[in-house]
């Protein structure tokens, strides 16, 4: 057992580095070359692109994303959506569940998938047993199970042609200046793989690499093998090895996320 195991148990009961190390190592061994292969293939493939200068207003994104969240089942009579620097959700109690998102007027997917992710968390909170709130029976099973709900909605549902077929009328109504994309084109845009710096905006290929990077650094810090002062250097070095790009500033590296 290690000091880090104690903290892991707080978040996912019974899990240790002996469980995670081989899982992550095997996944990373395949993901790093897969990421390189996909990004190289995308350079020569005829991929749809976002037109330069196209603006997706904050109000239009809010309207579109609220419609998606409501269709997913979120009860706006027992919760609300707001804006914040970093998306998050908070289940204050079953009758008051809130989540936030952020807006980028040149990238509507950033807001959309943040909303779908946080709505997934919020739906789990709204679905807990109200009669047993404040007891184990009325609480989330674990953070891992909680995250499974958010990631399921964001990716298994949200990054499919079937999803885009359903929401296409709302997309066109809210963004009339966008090209006349069909559900397949929008799905290809939403599934583009990129070597990006920000975890919460990562695609399915790179997301787990972001998580593994944090895991490896956390192990070193809590086991006494890395000083906090050296964290940026360790982060940037590992990111370069796995993603093949340099982190230009800590705002895009170890300081990007309040719960990284």
Predicted regions and their residues:
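Active-site recognition of the HExxH zinc-binding catalytic motif
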Residues: 103, 110-130, 147-154
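Inter-helical turn/loop segments and adjacent helix faces that build the functional surface
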Residues: 14-18, 37-49, 129-136, 157-168, ...
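Secondary-structure capping and boundary motifs in well-ordered enzyme cores
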Residues: 23, 57, 91-95, 104-112, ...
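Long, amphipathic alpha-helical stalk/connector segments used for oligomerization, subunit docking
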Residues: 157-259
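Active-site-adjacent bridging/hinge elements
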Residues: 89-98, 122-129, 183-192, 248-253
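Glycine- and acidic
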Residues: 45-51, 97-105, 129-136, 197-202, ...
């Amino acid at each position: 057992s290690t000091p880090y195991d104690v903290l892991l148990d707080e978040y996912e009961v019974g899990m240790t580095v002996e469980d995670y190390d081989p899982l992550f190592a095997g996944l990373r061994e395949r993901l790093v070359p897969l990421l390189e292969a996909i990004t190289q293939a995308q350079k020569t493939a005829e991929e749809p692109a976002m037109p330069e200068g196209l603006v997706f207003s904050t109000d239009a994104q809010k309207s579109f994303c609220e419609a998606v969240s409501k269709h997913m089942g979120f009860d706006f009579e027992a919760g609300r959506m707001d804006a914040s620097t970093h998306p998050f959700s908070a289940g204050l109690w079953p009758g008051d569940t809130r989540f936030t998102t952020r807006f980028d007027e040149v990238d509507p997917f950033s807001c959309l998938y943040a909303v779908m992710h946080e709505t997934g968390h919020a739906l789990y909170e709204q679905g807990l047993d109200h009669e047993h709130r404040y007891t184990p029976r009325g609480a989330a099973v674990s953070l891992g199970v909680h995250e499974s709900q958010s990631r399921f909605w964001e990716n298994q549902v949200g990054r499919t042609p079937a999803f885009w077929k359903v929401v296409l009328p709302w997309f066109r109504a809210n963004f009339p200046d966008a090209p006349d994309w069909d559900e397949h084109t929008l799905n290809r845009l939403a599934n583009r793989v990129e070597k990006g710096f920000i975890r919460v905006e990562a695609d399915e290929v790179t997301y787990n690499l972001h998580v593994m990077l944090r895991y490896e650094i956390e192990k070193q810090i809590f086991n006494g093998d890395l000083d906090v002062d050296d964290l940026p250097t360790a982060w940037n070095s590992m990111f370069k090895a796995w993603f093949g790009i340099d982190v230009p500033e800590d705002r895009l590296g170890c300081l990007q996320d309040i719960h990284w």
